[in-house]
Design a protein with these regions (language model features):
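Acidic, glycine-rich loop-and-strand cores that form catalytic or ligand-binding grooves
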Residues: 192-245
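Low-complexity, Gly/Ser/Thr/Pro-rich intrinsically disordered linker/tail segments
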Residues: 266-315
């Protein structure tokens, strides 16, 4: 990837009106997703085409609001939702993240390269840009990695200008991560969905990170399952797709599954956001468009072409 294009990508600043997007989303969930992707891609590429390389904007995370100095820490947020039901907790998660209450290090994206070899022998290559950790609420010094259901995850991804990863992306992120956690499952049961389990698992991850000396803000993986997009959801709308929690390269604990409903979330789930803009064959393209291309999609997906609106199911 050329340095000029790389700098151009990292200096991107979206000018899309989220009020307009929100209005369209409410018209129809499925059609709203299609409209959202079309508007997001068009806005992204227009901004990238007109931005001077020397202009330093907030980058691909420019649609994420700044964190308020008065925002809750991760511990405070956990306390605030410890005795509410799951629906109330989801609304609280959405509210906190929409207000920009997430650690600063999540705004510094990491490049991850993926490839696909054509029958002709030519290798196609793409670089996606991902948040270095799973979504969390709080500050750099006190944050809670926060699982959430598919409805909440899709709303946040679209609001911030991101998409959820494919299964192939999850594998690539794990392979590229310099810091790979060893999975730490907790006993199964209804308590898996509790805020207390969220806290306990978060503390376990922090302890392992400190023990193994993982650098702050590094690209990490292996500590949670990913919520992903998949064509399976076109046949199982209303479900959530999860995959990952790797024990090593090519060895996920969780194979691709759509057994749970879209409203389900437990401590083992994580939301990894992927920028809606990627570099492929030296060009800036929208991930949505790449995944719809019958050839290019293979670089980012091991399922072939994926229509994201359908792949999100009934989110």
């Amino acid at each position: 990837m050329g340095q000029a294009l790389y700098e151009l990508l990292l200096s991107y600043n979206s000018s899309l009106s989220w009020t307009s997007l929100s209005d369209r989303w409410r018209l129809s969930r499925r059609n709203g997703i299609k409209l959202a992707f079309s508007a997001l891609c068009a806005g992204s590429l227009r901004a990238s085409e007109t931005r001077d390389e020397s202009t330093q904007g907030p980058g691909l995370t420019g649609s994420i609001p700044p964190r308020s100095l008065q925002a809750l820490t991760g511990s405070q947020f956990a306390d605030s939702v410890s005795n509410v039901d799951r629906q109330q907790r989801e609304r609280a998660i959405l509210g906190q993240l929409f207000e920009g209450n997430l650690p600063g290090f999540l705004r510094k994206l990491a490049p991850v390269k993926l490839t696909y070899e054509l029958a002709s022998g030519k290798t196609l290559a793409a670089t996606i840009f991902v948040v270095p950790e799973y979504l969390a609420i709080g500050s750099d010094h006190d944050f809670l990695r926060i699982p959430m259901n598919l409805h909440t995850a899709v709303a946040i991804a679209n609001r911030f200008g991101f998409v959820l990863p494919t299964k192939k992306m999850v594998d690539a992120i794990y392979d590229h991560s310099p810091c790979q956690f060893k999975p730490q499952p907790l006993p199964a049961g209804p308590q898996m969905m509790s805020t207390e389990y969220y806290r306990v698992h978060n503390a376990m991850i922090e302890k392992q990170s400190e023990t193994r000396g993982f650098p702050f803000g590094a690209l990490v993986s292996g500590h949670k399952k990913d919520v992903v997009v998949t064509n399976r959801l076109t046949k199982r709308p209303g479900q959530i797709a999860i995959y990952g929690w790797h024990r090593g390269a090519g060895a996920p604990i969780q194979p691709l599954s759509t057994v749970h409903g879209a409203g389900y979330a437990d401590y083992s789930h994580g939301i990894r956001l992927v920028s809606r803009l990627a570099m492929i064959e030296g060009r800036l393209r929208c991930v949505h468009d790449i995944l719809q291309d019958s050839v290019l999609a293979n670089v980012l997906s091991d399922e072939g072409a994926i229509r994201l609106a359908s792949a999100y199911g009934a989110a």
